[in-house]
From Swiss-Prot:
Plays a role in intracellular Ca(2+) homeostasis. Involved in cell protection against oxidative stress in strain 25W. InterPro entries: BOBF_sf, BOF, Ca-regulated_OB-fold. Strain 25W was isolated in the ocean, whereas the reference strain PAO1 came from wounds in infected humans. SUPFAM superfamilies: Hypothetical protein YgiW. GO terms for cellular component: periplasmic space. Transmembrane segments: none annotated. One of its GO terms (biological process) is calcium ion homeostasis. The keyword Iron-sulfur does not apply. Its main location: periplasm. Disruption phenotype: Does not affect growth at high Ca(2+) level. Does not affect the basal intracellular concentration of Ca(2+), but impairs recovery to the resting intracellular Ca(2+). Increases sensitivity to tobramycin at high Ca(2+). In strain 25W, increases sensitivity to tributyltin (TBT), cadmium, mercury, acidic pH and hydrogen peroxide. This is Calcium-regulated OB-fold protein CarO. Pfam families: BOF.
Length: 116
């Protein structure tokens, strides 16, 4: 195979991945959890989209997140934060999934968005 076809193959792979990442939302799809209360009761790997505030940093990349229904731990890697400062008054939308282990549940955050 010639190298001139490599960009075309890479583009096809990229666009097909973006389409798959959107996910299925029709009948039989796993519903997205939208509150801390529901996330605390959800199964492992349940998708979540939560809106509220990051109250404090507990340690490392573990933070306490709060919405109108309660609070829980969330894990946010530095590269997942937006390029602006966030404090305990900033409303954010967290997208991720429930991470359940022997100690309890936390949210493994994949994306942080500031709500204006």
């Amino acid at each position: 195979m010639k190298l001139r076809h490599l960009p075309l193959i890479a583009a096809i792979g990229l666009f097909s991945t973006v389409t798959l990442a959107a996910g299925y939302t029709g009948p039989g799809a796993t519903p997205t959890t939208t509150t801390v209360k529901a996330a605390l009761e959800a199964a492992d790997d349940t998708p979540v989209v939560l809106q509220g505030t990051i109250v404090k940093r507990i340690k490392g990349d573990i933070y306490e997140f709060r919405d109108a229904t309660g609070s829980m731990k969330v894990e946010i890697d530095d590269e997942d934060f937006p390029p602006m400062e966030i404090n305990d008054k900033t409303r954010v939308k967290l997208t991720g999934e429930v991470d359940r282990d022997l100690v309890g549940r936390e949210i493994d955050v994949e994306f942080v968005e500031v709500i204006k």
